[in-house]
A protein has these predicted regions:
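A long amphipathic alpha-helix within ATP-dependent nucleotide-binding catalytic cores
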Residues: 168, 206-253, 274-292
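Active-site nucleotide/adenylate-binding loops and adjacent lid/helix of ATP-dependent enzymes
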Residues: 1-8, 14-19, 54-55, 79-83, ...
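Glycine-rich phosphate/pyrophosphate-binding beta-alpha loops
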Residues: 66, 257-269
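ATP-binding N-terminal substructure of ATP-dependent carboxylate-amine bond-forming enzymes
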Residues: 1-87
Length: 293
């Protein structure tokens, strides 16, 4: 069985995945996403890295960032059409590449998300913020790990940021701020399996790790588990991380990330080898597909 791991930037995360994958798969190939090209003919299509055709692989695990989302959309579609196992459906990266779009899709499927507004106009944003009520969360529609996420407590804080975002041609997404006690939970969905850790910060309302949050053991409710599973299913992810908060007694999804952070520290807190479970899941699906073909 052959697995390719596609990555946007070299990091210890990909090295950890490679180590675990080599324990399970017969052959493992690391592929930089900027080294790929598509070849479309009348009767065939190929996804090439040098002279290697990834459509001949059993499984491909894709980890990318927001800069490569459009490329990832075409990539996962080409691989899925050729029968290669991936962790995403054809439409998944169109959802992940736009935070407002993903929230819209989740809401349309009955999943709790903060009320959101999407606009190109700073003036419209100011008016919308009054309707949402301060404080409001300001987001660029792209970005992961807390990038491009700010909070405004008043119009005087909001307007300059909106003007700056407009000058840099950034699309604007506003969200209502949900009180959650400074803690959110990263729920990792791998098939039907759910595992999690919480992230807490006393000094920053953004509790994500890159924003200064600390990983702590999570207390998952059944509602949170089911909400994360449904969110993954709606957006087409077989493997993903869902950022979940509890507010007003209900779980709310803040974001879905296919390239969520992984580390040995995370494994220790959760009490499971998450990376190994990711690789095992890819292997299980590839093996089942081969048996059925």
């Amino acid at each position: 069985m052959k697995l390719a791991i596609i990555y946007g930037e070299v990091s210890t995360k990909h090295q950890l995945i490679m180590e675990r994958a080599e324990e399970i798969f017969d052959s493992v190939l690391a592929v930089p996403i900027d080294g790929l090209k598509f070849l479309h003919g009348e009767e065939e299509q190929k996804v090439l890295y040098k002279d290697i055709d990834l459509t001949e692989y059993d499984a491909v695990y894709i980890r990318t960032d927001d800069r490569d989302m459009m490329f990832a959309e075409h990539l996962v579609e080409a691989l899925n059409e050729e029968g290669v196992v991936t962790q995403a459906s054809n439409d998944t990266y169109s959802y992940e590449s736009n935070k407002f779009y993903s929230m819209k899709v989740l809401a349309e499927n009955g999943i709790n998300v903060p009320d959101s507004v999407y606009t190109l106009s700073p003036d419209v944003a100011v008016s919308a913020a009054k309707e949402l009520g301060y404080p409001v969360i300001m987001k660029t529609v792209k970005g992961v790990g807390g990038e491009g996420v700010m909070r405004a407590s008043s119009e005087s804080e909001l307007k300059p940021v909106m003007d700056t975002m407009k000058s840099f041609q950034q699309e604007i997404c506003l969200q209502e701020f949900k009180e959650h006690g400074g803690t959110d939970t990263r729920v990792i969905v791998i098939g039907d399996e759910v595992m999690a850790y919480s992230r807490s910060s006393d000094d920053d309302w953004r509790s994500n790790i890159s924003g200064g949050g600390e990983r702590v053991e999570a207390q998952l409710t059944e509602k949170m588990k089911e909400t994360a599973r449904r969110a993954a299913g709606v957006t087409g992810f077989d493997i993903c991380g869902c950022d979940v908060i509890e507010s007003e007694g209900e779980p709310f999804i803040l974001e879905i990330n296919g390239s969520f952070g992984i580390s040995k520290e995370m494994n220790q807190i959760i009490g499971q080898d998450v990376v190994l479970r990711i690789v095992e899941r890819m292997h299980e699906r590839a093996l089942q597909k081969k048996r059925n073909s």
